[in-house]
Amino acid sequence: MFLLVLIPLISPLWAGEIVTQNIKQWAKKAVEEEKALRPIAARNTVAVLYFENKTGKSELDPLQKGLALMLITDLFNVKGLQVVERVKLQALVEEMGFGTSGLVEAGNAPRVGRILGARWLIGGEITRGSIKIQSSVLDVGEKKIIGQPMVMGEMEDLFRLEKGLLFEIINFLKIDITPQEREELRRYCSTNVRALNLLFRGIDASDRGNYEKAAQFYESAIKEDPKICIARGALQELQALGLIDSKKRSRDMLRTLRDRGSLTDQLSPEDATKRVRTPKDIPSSQGRETP
């Protein structure tokens, strides 16, 4: 992974998980006006690229967007950070014709970061072994690597690996967090790896415009873990935008979504075995403001 010191031009609104026509138009205009961008001093703006799967195992492909999704969700809750919406990254990927691997090719990442308006750009790769996430922190101004965080473990520990990476990133960004904030950031999106995988597949299906399939993945993720983050909001966003046929959706499922707590439920490490509901301030899918 690398962090690049770049130029910020970030929108203050969080755009949810749907790459809307407005977001696509933004990406098209941003690329067209790329040469006119001026260096603007701004603090603590971060964008997270998709991770590259170098394991040769296609079953790990959902982690490419999934790891980025979890990091973005967590970094959004770090006070003092501005986080670029994932949908803006996705729109740029489509507009610029990059695949997931193309984002991290030489010269592409700084360009993407500049258009996104990010001071720091986070990316990385998943390599062979159980799960090994190798990363580097690059200071572009100084042209030197200032850190190389790395986490590794079993697939069943994915949710813990992401937290380890999160706190390494926070350390390299030299962001001070209180013990209370640290404890809140330790809350898991889910400890159910199957549920996480279904969520990640739903995000990818949505990006591809297969909204009915995305809804099915979200529903399956919620059935696996009713307290999983993001999935409820993403499903309700699909419904609110009229992208799925709500009449075909199970009334029982919709009732379950309303009755099983808020969109912000997450699990603390202590709750991982207790399965006790704990509220967490994950932003809703629309109208979210960056701290």
Task: Please state what every model-predicted region is.
Residues 24-33, 90-196:
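Catalytic-center loop of serine/cysteine hydrolases
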Residues 54, 62-64, 78-125, 129, ...:
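Short, solvent-exposed, polar/charged sequence segments at loop or secondary-structure edges
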